[in-house]
A protein has these predicted regions:
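Glycine-rich, low-complexity intrinsically disordered segments
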Residues: 1-99, 103-160
Length: 160
């Protein structure tokens, strides 16, 4: 098995302060580019409405990884599915990809909304979202993800 060493290119500043399954919407945060990268690496990004952001579940522990089928969120109404069918910190590399909306760029700071990472999260990579690189046909999925994520993007101000 190959091993890769990666360094974060940016850090999430502000936004969500705790991990929570739902109510991720409407929260603004900053993706702050590390000083090691010249500002020129962001040139032109302000012309895009959305970003593709790969980040690490930095609050997760190695022992959180689960390499077996289980019901999403522990809900027995949903079918047991394998590790690579889940989008959470229990994956082997504890990485996630999100598609926040880019509001503006201020120097090293990319102000975004709807980034479901918490303050202090290391960003491994970022790129503009190209519509042409999204799914090329209709998306098919079982019913449980829509049921499970029905409240995911509700406004965070409505959190119980």
């Amino acid at each position: 098995m190959a091993t890769y060493e990666v360094e974060s290119i940016a850090t999430v500043v502000g936004g969500h302060t705790r991990v929570q399954d739902d109510y991720q919407g409407g929260v603004e945060s900053i993706i702050r580019l590390n000083d090691a990268y010249p500002l020129e690496t962001l040139q032109g990004i302000e012309e895009f409405s959305h970003l593709t952001v790969t980040w690490r579940f930095h609050l997760a522990r190695p022992e959180d990884v689960e390499l077996h089928a289980r019901s999403p969120r522990g809900n027995p109404r949903w079918p047991a599915t394998g590790t690579f069918v889940h989008r959470n910190h229990r994956r082997p590399n504890q990485l996630a990809t999100s598609y926040p909306r880019l509001l503006r760029v201020e120097g090293r700071d990319l102000l975004v909304t709807d980034l479901d990472a918490v303050d202090g999260t290391p960003v491994i990579d970022l790129a503009p979202y190209f519509e042409e690189m999204g799914p090329r046909s209709a998306v098919r999925q079982p019913a449980w993800p829509s049921e499970m994520l029905g409240r995911y993007w509700l406004d965070a101000s409505g959190r119980p």
